[in-house]
Regions:
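Generic hydrophobic segment detector
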Residues: 52-59, 95-97, 181, 192-202
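Cysteine-cluster motifs in flexible loop/terminal segments that predominantly coordinate metals
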Residues: 154-197
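Short Fe-S-cluster ligation motifs
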Residues: 143-145, 202-206
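Histidine (H) residue identity feature
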Residues: 15, 83, 150, 195, ...
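Long, charged N-terminal interaction/targeting segments
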Residues: 2-138
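Extended non-catalytic scaffold regions that mediate assembly and binding
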Residues: 1, 98-106, 129, 133-146, ...
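Polar/charged alpha-helical tracts
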Residues: 5-8, 69-72, 121-124, 147-154, ...
Length: 206
């Protein structure tokens, strides 16, 4: 999509932009599919605005003892955002900085494109994955604490990178004290157990 065909850009120019995905096996946190919007919808936006897209996924417990299957499940979840192509909604994603900028066409705005419709497209794609039970998609189009959102995105990226590295195969006799992932493992419950093959399913009490 050429710039002259765009009505505006979400996260364009000097505006903030961030996206990240959280995963939980606690069904109470994502009891149903949902699309939430904080800020103006697409038909109300008149120029470039800040933008965030946050996804919270409810997933089945992944059997980490089957490391190849667990690794594939995590990677498949990450790739969903590259398979959503709403008409007139062009995504530019920078994995290194967790930025996601969107160019929205004038034609799409006239046709009634909305965040609800785009969110439903994301949900449809995510739920093709049999490990995913429910999806909450959150869009933000106004000024909020983007510094905190970027910090959260960085933390999630570090955890995902650590999990991927563990599942790809780390020596079980590795000295944790000398490992670059130690700060992440110290903070996130279960990563050390995952590394040493002792992951146990947590019991959920009502």
């Amino acid at each position: 999509m050429l710039l002259r065909d765009a009505a505006y850009e979400l996260g364009g120019g000097a505006n903030e932009a961030v996206n990240f995905t959280c995963v939980t096996s606690d069904a109470a946190l994502v009891p149903s599919d949902e699309v939430l919007l904080y800020g103006p919808d697409m038909k109300e936006i008149k120029g470039d605005v800040p933008f965030a897209r946050i996804v919270i996924l409810g997933v089945k417990d992944i059997d980490v003892e089957k490391k190849d299957a667990a690794y594939a499940a995590i990677r498949n979840i990450e790739f969903v955002k590259y398979h959503v192509f709403p008409d007139g909604y062009m995504m530019r994603v920078s994995p290194e900085s967790s930025r996601e900028q969107i160019r929205v066409s004038k034609k799409a705005v006239k046709k009634g494109i909305s965040f609800y419709k785009v969110g439903c497209d994301f949900i449809k794609q995510y739920k093709k994955n049999p490990n995913i039970t429910n999806v909450r998609v959150i869009f933000v189009t106004k000024d909020v604490d983007f510094k905190a959102l970027h910090a959260t995105a960085k933390k999630i990226e570090d955890v995902t990178k650590t999990m991927n590295t563990i599942l790809e195969g780390m020596p079980e006799d590795l000295d944790c004290a000398s490992c670059s992932f130690k700060p992440v493992c110290d903070e996130v419950e279960g990563l050390k157990e995952l590394h040493f093959g002792k992951a146990a399913k947590k019991e959920h009490h009502a």
